[in-house]
Amino acid sequence: MAKLILATFAVVFMALAATSLAGDPDMLQDVCVADYKSLKGPLRLNGFPCKRIENVTANDFFFDGLMKAGNTGNAVGSVVTAASVESLPGLNTMGVSMARIDYAPWGLNPPHTHPRATEIIFVVEGSLDVGFVTTANKLFTRTVCKGEVFVFPRGLVHFQKNNGNTPAFAIAALNSQLPGTQSIAAALFGAAPPLPSDTLARAFQVDGGMVEFIKSKFVPPKY
């Protein structure tokens, strides 16, 4: 009996562990096209409610937003165009998404994390200096050229920088329909309400005036 209980516990534990390692929960039907209209009501859940199957069309599984380069005319010189469940409703419950990342010459996709997904990028044009930092603060970095691939582990801080004087772009794949993106600088210096300046000053070991100067570069979101 003891062996049976132990074996049962082991099987249950392994099943739970496998589920916890998945990027998104497994789908329970062929398709579950996101019904954005339902979000205006009281219904809230981890994901999106399904559109009625009789209202689903092929267009729910189509997105042409990655065809053209995005506008990189901003302070960091990069822009991300996401093909996630928010723009491609047919991705709901599929556990995957894509993105196009465009870089101006010397443009930077600043240090950020994806809390819900691992990311793999394929460089289509140009050459990028990329890297990620582990929880032990070890940096893994290298140059990735046209036709090459690099992977960023889930939840770790990472970046990409165009190291050339011509535009570059890459295609990213992620194992979540909505991986989430948190820019480190914007999260710390552009939060709403703002983080206390004395907290940031002590964390970065600088004076309060420097913190206020950096905060002035970020526009807090409006809720």
UniProtKB/Swiss-Prot annotation:
Its main location: secreted. Mn(2+) binds at residues 112, 114, 119, 158. Keywords: Apoplast, Disulfide bond, Glycoprotein, Manganese, Metal-binding, Secreted, Signal. Pfam families: Cupin_1. This is Germin-like protein 1-3. May play a role in plant defense. Probably has no oxalate oxidase activity even if the active site is conserved. It is found in: Secreted, Extracellular space, Apoplast. GO terms for molecular function: manganese ion binding. Glycans are attached at residue 55. One of its GO terms (cellular component) is plasmodesma. InterPro entries: Cupin_1 (IPR006045), Germin (IPR001929), Germin_Mn-BS (IPR019780), RmlC-like_jellyroll (IPR014710), RmlC_Cupin_sf (IPR011051). Belongs to the germin family. Transmembrane segments: none annotated. Residues 1-22 form the signal peptide. Residues 64-212 form the Cupin type-1 domain. Oligomer (believed to be a pentamer but probably hexamer). SUPFAM superfamilies: RmlC-like cupins (SSF51182). PROSITE patterns: GERMIN. Disulfide bonds join 32-50. One of its GO terms (biological process) is regulation of root development.
